[in-house]
């Protein structure tokens, strides 16, 4: 049995959850998110909790059960607290400017690299750090991954864009002649 799917989701004050035929709407102080209903699952709102159940005990149903519960939980957290990921830029001559929806970076290429975030995601810059924030966990993670992919950290000196809490595996340089 799915251990995650069996746990009820507590609804905080100020959050309303509406269960529809094909989607679940979660509205809160930071905004509104729509979660699609997964097959073979049913969602009920009872008192101050959301309970997700499944129709049978097939392996696929168990997987959908846990996924549905996790998606609803992420939506509830998103509309109350929000999500954020922090990235840092390391490298000589690497610069960062802008904020809001668009940032411009000098990453050692012959041209400045511009990145425009999708709607619902905010970018803030602080010296050599980028903070990606928003209410949709999937969008925030996707934007952070796209920014990181512009200049992945290299293993010798660690130059590039990396997550703040990421641990890089470094390599030793060439030994050379003696």
Where would I find each of the regions flagged by the language model?
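N-terminal intrinsically disordered, cationic/polar leader segments
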Residues: 2-145, 149-178
